[in-house]
Amino acid sequence: MSDFNKDEYLNDLPDMDDLSGQAAPAAASADSAAAAAGATQEGAAQPAAAQSQENGDSAAADGADKAGAADGKADDTLTPLGQAKKEAAEYLEALQRERAEFINFRNRAQKEQERFRQHGIIDVLTALLPALDDIDRIREHSEMDDSFKAVANKIDKAFEKFGVEKFGEKGEDFDPTKHDAILHKPDPNAEKETVDTVVEAGYRIGDRVIRAARVVVASPQN
């Protein structure tokens, strides 16, 4: 057996630079292979996704076509009499809708017309209130001749014709919603608040008070 020579053994070992040079091409080859595999998988996934979307759209379109075809087929299966009844029912439904809309429009128009009518009456009555108050004072404090009394009665009837109601009388219960108390007078005989004197009459149309009656109120003594 020959003797082991350490120096010869070390000289025969490859250098580190040579090993690095051999490892680098191997690593580069591995990276290239991995990138190629990833690109192949991505390329395969994109057509698959596109195909899936296309299949979904096609299925939806087929469903809509089948639904339309089913409706058309249902109409085709009707007899001429059945088809006529179906069309008549559709026309009747449309006519009923139009009639309901017309009735609603007519009701709104009537309410609007009545509102304008009342506004016109209120404007005229408001302008004539001072004259009406003077007529009431003449009636209360002096006697009217027949001609003047006839004119006053015609005015009252004209306002009644348009739905104007005159209110406010001595002895009626005091109501703050229609009476304007200008004075409260204690009365030992009064059990509750009542109208003692009507200074100016009140007027209303229906439930709407145009002017509250101005009154003197007799109140119970505490």
From Swiss-Prot:
The keyword Cytoplasm applies. Disulfide bonds: none annotated. Keywords: Chaperone, Cytoplasm, Stress response. The keyword Chaperone applies. Its main location: cytoplasm. One of its GO terms (molecular function) is protein homodimerization activity. PROSITE patterns: GRPE. It is found in: Cytoplasm. One of its GO terms (biological process) is protein folding. Pfam families: GrpE (PF01025). InterPro entries: GrpE, GrpE_coiled_coil, GrpE_head. Residues 1-82 are annotated as: Disordered. One of its GO terms (cellular component) is cytoplasm. Residues 20-71 have a biased composition (Low complexity). Homodimer. HAMAP family: GrpE. NCBIfam families: PRK14157.1. Belongs to the GrpE family. Participates actively in the response to hyperosmotic and heat shock by preventing the aggregation of stress-denatured proteins, in association with DnaK and GrpE. It is the nucleotide exchange factor for DnaK and may function as a thermosensor. Unfolded proteins bind initially to DnaJ; upon interaction with the DnaJ-bound protein, DnaK hydrolyzes its bound ATP, resulting in the formation of a stable complex. GrpE releases ADP from DnaK; ATP binding to DnaK triggers the release of the substrate protein, thus completing the reaction cycle. PANTHER family: GRPE PROTEIN (PTHR21237), GRPE PROTEIN HOMOLOG, MITOCHONDRIAL (PTHR21237:SF23). This is Protein GrpE.
